[in-house]
C-alpha cells in the first residue's frame, strides 16, 4: 500500500524525479533480504531511506547538486548510526538465528562504529555551517548536536537492550536539532 501511495505522490514530480524515484523500487524490494546477505543491511537501508534527498534535488534543481549529495551522505550515515543502535537490542537473537547486521559484525566495537558515523555526519554538516549565512547560530546548534551525541554514545550500554532502545529513540532529539540546523542555511 505504501509503495502505491508513494507512486501516486511521485507522479506529481517532474520526469527526471519520477525516473529517479522508480529506480529505487528494486532496492526497496531487495531490502528485506539484506540481513541474510550482508552484515551491512543498515547501509542498504540508509541508501533507500535517504533516496528522497536525491529526488528533491532533482525536482528543484533538475540535477543532483553537490550540497544535496552531501545531505544524502549525512542521511545515510545517520541511518547507519541509529539503526546500528537499534540492532543491538536483538543482537543475541540475530547471532543465534544467523541474521547479519552491523551489531553482529562490530560486536563489542559497535560504539566506535556509531561514533565514527556521527563524526562523519558532523564533519559534513560543518561544511554547511562554514558556508551558512547565519554562522553563529548554526555553530551553536552543531556544537549542541556534537555534545549531546557524544554524551548519549558514552552512556549507551551496547549489552543492554533497554539502553539500546532508549538511545535509539533519542535520535528524535538528533532529528529535531538537525532540522533546526538545516533552517539556518
Where are these regions (language model features)?
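Residue-level recognition of pore/gate-forming positions within transmembrane alpha-helices
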Residues: 3-4, 25-28, 49-50, 75, ...
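Small-residue-rich segments of transmembrane alpha-helices in multi-pass membrane proteins
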Residues: 45-58, 105, 168-182
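Cytosolic, membrane-interface loops and tails of multi-pass inner-membrane proteins
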Residues: 1, 83-107, 154-162
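Multi-pass membrane catalytic core of lipid/isoprenoid biosynthesis enzymes
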Residues: 1-21, 77, 96-136, 140
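Residue-level signal for inorganic ion chemistry
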Residues: 41, 90, 171
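Intramembrane alpha-helical segments
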Residues: 1-70, 127, 150-157, 162
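Extended hydrophobic alpha-helices typical of membrane-associated regions
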Residues: 127-185
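Alpha-helical transmembrane segments of multi-pass membrane proteins
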Residues: 28-32, 74-82, 86, 144-151
Amino acid at each position: 500500500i505504501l509503495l502505491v501511495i508513494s507512486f501516486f505522490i511521485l507522479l506529481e514530480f517532474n520526469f527526471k524525479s519520477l525516473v529517479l524515484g522508480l529506480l529505487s523500487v528494486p532496492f526497496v524490494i531487495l531490502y528485506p533480504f539484506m540481513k541474510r546477505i550482508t552484515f551491512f543491511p543498515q547501509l542498504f537501508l540508509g541508501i533507500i531511506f535517504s533516496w528522497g534527498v536525491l529526488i528533491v534535488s532533482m525536482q528543484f534543481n533538475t540535477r543532483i547538486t553537490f550540497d544535496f549529495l552531501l545531505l544524502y551522505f549525512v542521511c545515510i550515515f545517520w541511518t547507519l548510526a541509529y539503526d546500528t543502535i537499534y540492532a543491538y537490542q536483538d543482537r543475541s537473537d540475530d547471532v543465534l538465528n544467523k541474521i547479519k547486521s552491523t551489531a553482529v559484525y562490530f560486536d563489542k566495537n559497535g560504539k566506535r562504529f556509531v561514533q565514527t558515523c556521527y563524526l562523519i555526519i558532523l564533519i559534513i554538516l560543518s561544511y554547511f555551517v562554514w558556508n551558512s549565512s547565519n554562522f553563529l547560530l548554526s555553530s551553536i546548534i552543531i556544537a549542541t548536536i556534537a555534545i549531546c551525541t557524544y554524551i548519549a554514545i558514552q552512556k549507551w550500554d551496547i549489552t543492554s537492550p533497554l539502553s539500546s532502545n532508549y538511545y535509539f529513540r533519542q535520535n528524535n532529539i538528533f532529528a529535531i536539532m538537525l532540522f533546526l540546523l538545516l533552517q539556518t542555511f
